[in-house]
Swiss-Prot record:
The gene is CBL8. It comes from Arabidopsis thaliana (Mouse-ear cress). The modification Phosphoserine is found at residue 205. It is found in: Cytoplasm; Nucleus; Cell membrane. This is Calcineurin B-like protein 8. Acts as a calcium sensor. CBL proteins interact with CIPK serine-threonine protein kinases. Binding of a CBL protein to the regulatory NAF domain of a CIPK protein lead to the activation of the kinase in a calcium-dependent manner.
Length: 214
């Protein structure tokens, strides 16, 4: 009996910290089991790019997903924060899949909208204040080739607050945010990554050795 328990423990030890059953993740996200297997191969590549511990550290995350991976950027930091659901400074496989699923084409817009609201709510107060909006607009511009002056960014923020803050309390609440998104659906454009609909085609080399079937 003891030998059996040891054998079972050794078998379970093959999975790194944070690993979750693909079938469970498939039941909670738009991804299929095979797609999650493909994402696991991608996750392994990312999580060993700098520190080989089966977890994605911020440096690895920024290097893989942002063109200015070596630079500090509030937007990049916020995305990492949102992926790090346990708030322990690293991204585990389950967190990676669940957070990435927000960007899936089949994920409802209200979920994408809620994710983006939290992204902009820097202090977690349930509101987006003008200074938070200004910081995030500047950070988003940092990921593009578009350069705007401080005055231009402030003008964008002032105009947005004027149009969105309907109850005139000086901040944007969740209902006001929903109305903004409803009137301007293009706001969520970057919240959808089309290739996630066909992960196994986007990353064909990752699934050659997969033995999992849906």
């Amino acid at each position: 009996m003891l030998a059996f328990v040891k054998c079972f423990s050794l078998k379970r030890a093959k999975h790194p910290r944070g690993y979750e059953d693909p079938h469970v993740l498939a039941s909670e996200t738009p991804f299929t089991v095979n797609e999650i297997e493909a994402l696991h191969d991608l996750f392994k590549k990312l999580s060993t790019s700098i520190i080989n511990d089966g977890l994605i550290h911020k440096e690895e995350f920024l290097l893989a997903l942002f063109r200015n991976g070596s630079m500090q950027n509030l937007f990049a930091d916020r995305v990492f924060y949102m992926f790090d659901r346990k708030r322990n400074g690293v991204i585990e496989f389950g967190e990676f899949v669940r957070s990435l699923s927000i960007f899936h084409p089949y994920t409802p817009e209200h979920e994408k909208s809620a994710f983006m609201f939290k992204l902009f709510d820097l202090h977690g107060t349930g509101f987006i204040e003008p200074h938070e909006l200004k910081k995030m607009v500047g950070a988003l511009l940092g990921e593009t080739d578009l350069e705007l002056s401080e005055e231009s960014i402030e003008a964008i923020v002032e105009q947005t607050m004027l149009e969105v803050d309907t109850n005139k309390d000086g901040k944007i609440d969740e209902e006001e945010w929903k109305e903004l998104v409803a009137k301007n659906p293009s706001i969520l454009k970057n919240m959808t990554l089309p290739y996630l609909k066909e992960v196994t085609l986007a990353f064909p080399s990752f699934v050659l050795d997969s033995e999992v079937e849906d």
